[in-house]
Amino acid sequence: MKPKMKYSTNKISTAKWKNTASKALCFKLGKSQQKAKEACHVYFMKLRSGLMIKKEACYFRRETTKRPSLKTDRKHKRHLVLAACQQQSTVESFAFGISGVQKYTRALHDSSITGISPITEYLASLSTYNDQSVTFALEDESYEIYVEDLKKDEKKDKVLLSYYESQRPSSESGDGVDGKMLMVTLSPTKDFWLHANNKEHSVELHKCEKPLADQAFFVLHNRPSNCVSFECKTDPGVFIGVKDNHLALIEVDSSENLGTENILFKLSET
């Protein structure tokens, strides 16, 4: 007679079995799950002229959670991985002692212009220290630049100013971003930019393709009486000025007062 064999069987309910299987499956498929959350830090920097710079540094906080195993007694281990995102700088308000100029709304990310990206753009009218308007006229399929008095009902021409960070330290004069002075390009109409002709000491409108030549860039200086001046990037000490009712390049000696009236301009939204 064969001995009887005894078997010990633990009964598991159907509901409990399904629950256990579900947990095991989830653990197997999601052993290492990652969740990314974006975090941003915003701070503001007010320059001497009132130019308000908004700095926004964003990064992703990626949280990796390892599912517990039976051996670890369901202990959780977490670690944070910080992935830095590209820092964005935008000029939130532009005020060289004036109420501000109209903000050109579209954001720019065109890195093809001389290898740098513009910070922002503004559309403004350009006038002299004596409130004469800078106008642009199409004559014989080319543009001419004039400095003249306008009638009250005449509409002022607008110029699109694109702002860039220059390599010149902002400690010299004027305003800057991240320790560097600002420089601008000026475009009164599409595909045309003000261009410094250093040989002829003149300011001309050139139809250009990107990348723009260095002659199209001017270092921006903040001046008294709500004025600014534009210094040639390619020829330090030479500024855009007014001569015989036209724009011209004027050399200003460093020992002289850079506040001379013929190189001072005003920017306005009207």
Curated annotation (Swiss-Prot):
PTM text: The full-length protein can be released from cells and is able to signal via the IL1RL1/ST2 receptor. However, proteolytic processing by CELA1, CSTG/cathepsin G and ELANE/neutrophil elastase produces C-terminal peptides that are more active than the unprocessed full-length protein. May also be proteolytically processed by calpains. Proteolytic cleavage mediated by apoptotic caspases including CASP3 and CASP7 results in IL33 inactivation.
Pfam families the UniProt entry points to: IL33_bt (PF15095)
Any one GO molecular-function label of the UniProt entry: cytokine activity
Propiece span(s): 1-94
InterPro entries the record matches: IL-33, IL33_C
Record-level GO cellular component terms: chromosome; extracellular space; nucleoplasm; transport vesicle
Localization, UniProt: Nucleus; Chromosome; Cytoplasm; Cytoplasmic vesicle, Secretory vesicle
Region (Homeodomain-like HTH domain): 1-65
Cysteines joined through disulfide linkages: none
Keywords, ordered alphabetically: Chromosome, Cytokine, Cytoplasm, Cytoplasmic vesicle, Nucleus, Secreted, Transcription
Protein family: Belongs to the IL-1 family. Highly divergent.
Quaternary organization: Forms a 1:1:1 heterotrimeric complex with its primary high-affinity receptor IL1RL1 and the coreceptor IL1RAP. Interacts with cargo receptor TMED10; the interaction mediates the translocation from the cytoplasm into the ERGIC (endoplasmic reticulum-Golgi intermediate compartment) and thereby secretion.
Domain topic, free-text comment: The homeodomain-like HTH domain mediates nuclear localization and heterochromatin association.
Protein known as: Interleukin-33
Provenance organism: Pongo abelii
Lineage, highest ranks first: Eukaryota, Metazoa, Chordata, Craniata, Vertebrata
Gene from which this protein is expressed: IL33
